Amino acid sequence: METGSEEEKWEKLDAEFDHFVVDMKPFVLKLPHRSERQRCALWIRKLCEPSGTGAGLMGRKNRNLYAKLLLHMLRRGILEGPFTHRPEPGTLKTLPSYMSIYFDEPNQAQPKDSSPEKLPDWVRGELQTGEQRLSDSWQCSSGEDNTLVLAASDAHREQYTGKLRMRSHSVSPTYREDKQHITSKICEVHSKTSPISLDDSDIEVRLNSWNLGIENPRYLRQKPLPVSLMTPKGSLRKASSLHDDHFLSRMHEKELDMKTKMMEAKFSEEKLKLQQKHDAEVQKILERKNNELEELKILYKKKQTETEETIRKLEKKVQILIRDCQVIRETKENQITELKKICEQSTESLNNDWEKKLHNAVAEMEKDKFELQKHHTETIQELLEDTNVRLSKMEADYVVQMQSTNHMIKELEGRVQQLMGEAENSNLQRQKLTQEKLELERCYQITCNELQELKTRRNILHKEKEHLVNDYEQNVKLLKTKYDSDINLLRQEHALSTSKTSGVIEELEQNICQLKQQVQESELQRKQQVKDQENKFHMEKNHLKHTYEKKVHELQSELDKEKEDAQRKIHKFEEALKEKEEQLSRVTEVQRLQAQQADAALEEFKRQVEVNSEKVYGEMKEQMEKVEADLTRSKSLREKQSKEFLWQLEDAKQRYEQQIVELKLEHEQEKTHLLQQHSAEKDSLVRDHDREIENLEKQLRAANMEHENQIQESKKRDAQVIADMEAQVHKLREELISVNSQRKQQLIELGLLREEEKQRAAKDHETAVKKLKAESERVKMELKKTHAAETEMTLEKANSRLKQIEKEYTQKLAKSSQIIAELQTTISSLKEESSRQQLAAERRLQDVIQKFEDEKQQLIRDNDQAIKALQDELETRSHQVRSAEKKLHHKELEAQEQIMYIRQEYETKFKGLMPASLRQELEDTISSLKSQVNFLQKRASILQEELTTYQSRR
């Protein structure tokens, strides 16, 4: 019944294929290009060939799927998929599951007229060449003419051979050779029968169907009559009943032999077909599973690379923004330093201008005095000249001291800037350390991925091992069933003749049981070895994980410690800079006090000389102090603004870093969630696959759709987050531009204020000079009267005060030189400390990098060794399996030889006891059993060759 249902299915599939081929005709003829037509003809010829489509039900279904897809594409007018190139030699590959999308689409173009047309010449040529090759390869010539008329048994034989022809499309080439061998034997028995040609009737029908429809399709043909089986028992009864007619009995025995041979061939055919079906189905399931797993892996890798690229782009943007902020900060600091220099230069130039103007005014006054004092004594003139010379020297010394102090201040400011640059360099080194930490984390992720790949490889090897074990068990079961069937046949045949053979058979059964026990023991030992090796591998993997995590924790702790040390050093440097700035402010205040004291001394001297000039000088001094106070206020405001701007930048940076960290955490959570979902779906698919094979494709499609939706949602979220981050970056840039514009406006306003103050000071100076001139003219007369009395007193006081001033200036110079020396020593010590710290940090970095590289190489070596060990174990196990199979085969052969030897002995014993008819019947049965044994030996060798080829492919 099962064979009949299979034949009906085959005929339905062939009829469906015939209809597909007929429907293709108008679309192939309407193709515009000749190359496309030739390609379609080649594909149709490939589908019509039995060697290309494959054997069994699955091969025909695959062929019909190809034909349906080609017809669908021809209706659409576009050739895609596998039909863009010529067909490959060998059997057709199974269509992937995603090709079913083509069948779901509606047909856009349908043929308006399906009237039969004539084939072009090139199509006929292609198909005729294909027919000739197929007919040449499938014919079995006997070399004699049809002269004899067939008897009733020959008619049955012809029907059976016709049936074999109908089924020959789905049989493997090895089986075809066996079949041709059997038919050649039949032809030898009937020496003058007609030659049996195994030409392909299916191909003729399909090729003829290109003309006016299908002339004789499969579903209109008559089914072949089943052959009635005759057992050897019936033949024995007939032979015993028809003992008289030797001629008729011989003919009947020959017919029975032929029938038994035909039944044996049919039985072997069906067995081979079932085996090929089973192998094809198993291979298709494995290929589908592997393809689906590879597609899922490719999708996951693509999505992972896309997320990594987005993260890298965001990190690059963050780095660019940080660099822009650093550049802006450096430009602002440079502007502040330039403004400081400009202010100092302007103050120095103003001081020099005022001093020059004062010198000019004093010179004019002295000239007037000398003109008034021409009439005085020469002694007074000499004293006045001496005092003027001393004053000029003191002023020159004061100018030199001021220049030296200003130069020292500039040098100290330059050193402060250098220290700031070194601090920035330390910050850059800290950033480099953070980057290296990120690289280490990436390396850690890469190693984790490698571990996952090793896990997948281990799982694949485990699956292959299970598959090999299952194949081995199936082969053992088949061999057991064969062996049991052979033993049962031998028992039935020899139970009639003798009861002595039962003991030998029991001994053989005991040997078989022992062999089974040995095989089971070897399988148990192999399973135990596999379990032990898996436990060892898990232990080694866990140990490696623990060691690697410990090393990562140690590296992270070292990095944290180095960060804390760097922060402490930065705090120390900042405190030292603050102390130096305070010292500089103190020095500047001391210098200002000294300048004020000198100005006070000069004012006292001038008050004694000119009473009215003291008021003007005091007013000018107050104005200068106001200007200096305004300058200090503006400096403080600038410093406050710069500090506020730095605080704002730091706050923005911290916010941005927090957002990046949050995004990374969200991304990792989504990744883990997706991985968990993927693993859960995978498990459910594997479980459902064992229960329902037909529903697997639907579940996979649903899972893929859900996975794609989740990925699209994650992409949308990532896109929204990226857009938000870009908007924040844009806002920060706008804020930076606005702050820069405000700073520029403030600088312009300060410049305008400075110019206005300069103009006011010049106007005030001109008015003061005019007043001085008027007052000097008034005082001239008064000075003439009081000068003579006061000159002596003033000279004495001036000498005493000059000596005091000289002493004070010498003391101040000594103090300032000491302070400068101390500052130089502190700067040199700070430079040495910074250089030492840099060298220590570089050494630590090099040590950490070397350690990490060594550990990485060790891990790689360990992984390689483990992989090699696993490969060696697999090879040894495969060798063990092969040796066990060979041993089983040898033992089977030995058992068969023993059986044959026992048969021969018993035949020799029973030759004298048995009649001639019984002897002939036993000889015939022995010859048939020998042929069966030879056939089974051939089949075992074929199965071994297939096993070796399958293992070599794996």
Curated annotation (Swiss-Prot):
Gene Ontology terms: biological process: receptor localization to synapse
Keywords of the record: Coiled coil, Cytoplasm, Cytoskeleton
Superkingdom of this protein's organism: Eukaryota
Assigned GO CC terms: centrosome; cytoplasm; inhibitory synapse; plasma membrane
Pfam families: DUF4485
InterPro entries on file: CEP112 (IPR055310), DUF4485 (IPR027831)
Main location: cytoplasm
Coiled-coil portions: 276-954
Subcellular localization, as worded in the UniProt entry: Cytoplasm, Cytoskeleton, Microtubule organizing center, Centrosome
PANTHER family documented for this protein: CENTROSOMAL PROTEIN OF 112 KDA (PTHR18871:SF2)
Name of the featured protein: Centrosomal protein of 112 kDa
Gene: Cep112
